[in-house]
């Protein structure tokens, strides 16, 4: 591949992510206001959870929230299956991020939140998913075309990161 092709590929990726952000901007609604209010009113910890790339985005959002004075941390849904659910309490706010909303590792986290009536904000693309249905506040991320082969989350994680920065 010639070097000139690299720039074309980069421009295509950037264009796809710009389109994703435009769709996200148009999608903001009252649920976004409800999510911000829940964060502002939280008198305990804000816990962000995800799997894979969504977990990495959750970690960045948690770090950003902590930087502005909101006690926050991230937890991998994989770790929750091995005893880390004990770090979440009733007064906490739980934000779960998943593109599909049906990732198997999230099921124990979602059930735990519902069982103990922990406020759950779901950041998800699929409205027919377990995460969407179980969330108290639903932030729907528009489904978008991923860059490259379409198997690695690129545009969708760009949307997740942007909504986290907005929160």
Task: List the predicted regions and their residue ranges.
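Glycine-rich phosphate-binding loops that contact phosphosugars or nucleotide phosphates
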Residues: 44-166
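An N-terminal, well-structured beta->alpha segment
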Residues: 2-44
């Amino acid at each position: 591949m010639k070097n000139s092709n690299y720039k074309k590929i980069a421009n295509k990726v950037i264009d796809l992510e710009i389109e994703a952000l435009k769709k996200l901007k148009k999608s903001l609604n009252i649920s976004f206001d409800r999510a911000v209010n829940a964060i502002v009113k939280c008198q305990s910890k804000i816990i962000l959870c995800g799997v894979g790339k969504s977990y990495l985005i959750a970690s960045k959002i948690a770090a950003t929230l902590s930087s502005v004075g909101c006690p926050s941390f991230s937890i991998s849904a994989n770790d929750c299956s091995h005893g880390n659910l004990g770090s979440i309490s009733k007064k906490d706010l739980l934000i779960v991020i998943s593109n599909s909303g049906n990732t198997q590792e999230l099921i124990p986290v979602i059930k735990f939140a519902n069982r103990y009536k922990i406020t759950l904000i779901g950041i998800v693309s699929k409205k027919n998913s377990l995460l969407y249905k179980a969330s108290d506040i639903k932030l729907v991320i528009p489904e978008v075309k991923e860059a490259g082969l379409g198997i690695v989350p690129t545009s969708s994680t760009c949307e997740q990161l942007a909504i986290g920065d907005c929160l």
